[in-house]
UniProtKB/Swiss-Prot annotation:
Record keywords: Cell inner membrane, Cell membrane, Chloride, Chloride channel, Ion channel, Ion transport, Membrane, Transmembrane, Transmembrane helix, Transport, Voltage-gated channel
InterPro entries registered for this protein in UniProt: Cl-channel_core, Cl-channel_volt-gated_ClcB, ClC, ClC-type_chloride_channel
Membrane-side (Periplasmic) residue stretches: 26-53, 167-172, 243-257, 312-315, 373-379
Species for this entry: Shigella flexneri
Family: Belongs to the chloride channel (TC 2.A.49) family. ClcB subfamily.
Membrane topology value: Multi-pass membrane protein
GO biological process, one term: response to acidic pH
CDD domains tied to this protein: Voltage_gated_ClC (cd00400)
Protein name according to UniProt: Voltage-gated ClC-type chloride channel ClcB
GO CC, alphabetical: chloride channel complex; plasma membrane
Cytoplasmic topological domain: 1-4, 75-145, 194-221, 279-290, 337-351, 401-418
Length: 418
């Protein structure tokens, strides 16, 4: 047992350096090609001329597609083992390391060029790769899946500053692929990754800054639960739209570089209306939480961002869909809150409350992981007073969504991009 805890600690540290390496590479490319040192792709897009804002995501997609196609032609074969940590956990616990690194590099290209895809997916993959590489050298074969799970949880903890949610992500999303008794090392890896990440960044700040002054009462619980019902209906719709967009891109029968370039071009066109469509949505989420916009502004940005996410994901851009889903949930919750706020004197607080609820419940509806989704929002914002209400709403959203759509967003995304 002591040996496992020691290895879990090492895996957590390796995951932090994997995540930090990707993050610093991303910041370097943004500085080199976009002249942006703010860390915000939305700021970068705002400061670019219209033609560069239009073409940059397309060129990034083209470069990523050429890289992926070139690697496949160079090796003259498809990956001989999984290039995704979920696939690795569901098979024999092995990766095609070279193909996985190329996939991560392609993700780096599309992320830094503005595609509306999550950077955290590549971070978690690299963390799992580091854990797998260590495990194959120093642990018996039957433990390889456990250490990949630890690496993924640690990567998620470092990327989102949410160690408990990172642990439960493994337990809920991949339920059945590992025994509950193995959760101890997973939690250790996640917490170690969170602590080391805080030390490296010289900060233990929350991922999102929120000023929610409301005290949750009976009326608020009713609104939170109703938001869960709404998210439970919206989740399957989002998954259906993502699947339809993917099929649409595939039906065009374009070579990977042109398919990814087309997805990037759509993002570029949308960014001419609002630069908020660039990136994974983190900056826009923070701005909405700081000062919730008016109804029509939320609706306009939401529609543009949704189309950008569908174009990026549908075209096969390598990256995560977790953070973009958080923004979509926030926007749905805030639109609902703004509509209800017309009849309540504290409309601003209701909008913010239901925005946070929307983040948690749409995440639950798309991942089918209600406990992880609840803890994720609480850990990222520090609003633990919402935990009871969010937990109920997330369970409701997950049940409704699972009834209407069998596959979670991760299983659907893995099936599309494998």
């Amino acid at each position: 047992m002591f040996r496992r805890l020691l290895i879990a600690t090492v895996v957590g540290i390796l995951a932090v350096f994997a995540v930090a390496g990707f993050r610093h590479a991303m910041l370097l490319l943004e500085w080199l090609f976009l002249n942006n040192d703010s860390g915000s792709l939305v700021n970068a897009a705002t400061n670019l001329s219209s033609w560069r804002r239009l073409l940059t995501p397309a060129l990034g997609g083209l470069a990523a597609g050429l890289l992926l196609m070139g690697w496949q032609k160079f090796t003259q074969q498809r990956p001989h083992a999984p290039t995704d940590y979920m696939e690795a956990l569901q098979t024999d616990g092995q990766f095609d390391y070279a193909a996985s690194l190329v996939k991560s590099l392609a993700s780096l290209l599309v992320v830094t060029s503005g595609s509306a895809i999550g950077r955290e997916g590549a971070m978690i993959l690299l963390a799992a790769l580091a854990a797998s590489c260590f495990a194959q050298r120093f642990t018996p074969r039957q433990e390889w899946k456990l250490w990949i799970a630890c690496g993924a949880a640690a990567g998620m903890a470092a990327a989102y500053r949410a160690p408990l949610a990172g642990s439960l992500f493994i337990a809920e999303v991949l339920f059945g692929t590992m025994m509950l008794a193995s959760l101890g090392p997973v939690i250790i890896s996640a917490i170690v990754a969170w602590l080391v990440s805080n030390l490296i960044n010289h900060s233990d700040a929350l991922l999102y800054n929120v000023q929610l002054s409301v005290t949750v009462q009976a009326r608020d619980y009713a609104l939170i639960i109703s938001t869960g019902v709404l998210a439970g209906l919206c989740g399957p719709l989002l998954l259906t739209l993502m699947n339809a967009c993917h099929r649409g891109f595939v039906s065009l029968k374009l070579a990977p570089p042109w398919q990814l370039a087309l997805g990037g071009l759509i993002v570029g066109l949308l960014s001419l209306f609002t630069p908020a469509v660039w990136g994974n949505g983190y900056s826009t989420v923070q701005s909405f939480l700081t000062a919730p916009p008016l109804l029509m502004i939320i609706a306009g940005i939401f529609l543009c961002k949704l189309c950008a996410v569908l174009a990026s994901s549908g075209s096969g851009a390598p990256g995560g869909v977790f953070t973009p889903t958080l923004f979509i949930g926030l926007a749905i919750g805030m639109l609902y809150g703004r509509s209800l706020g017309l009849w309540f004197p504290d409309g601003e607080e209701i909008t913010l409350l239901l925005g946070l609820t929307g983040m948690a419940t749409l995440l639950a509806a798309t991942t089918h992981a209600p406990i992880m989704s609840t803890l994720m929002i609480c850990e990222m914002t520090g609003e633990y007073q919402l935990l009871p209400g969010l937990l109920i709403a997330c369970v409701i959203a997950s049940v409704i969504s699972r009834t209407l759509h069998r596959d979670s967003i991760y299983r659907q995304h893995t099936a599309q991009h494998s």
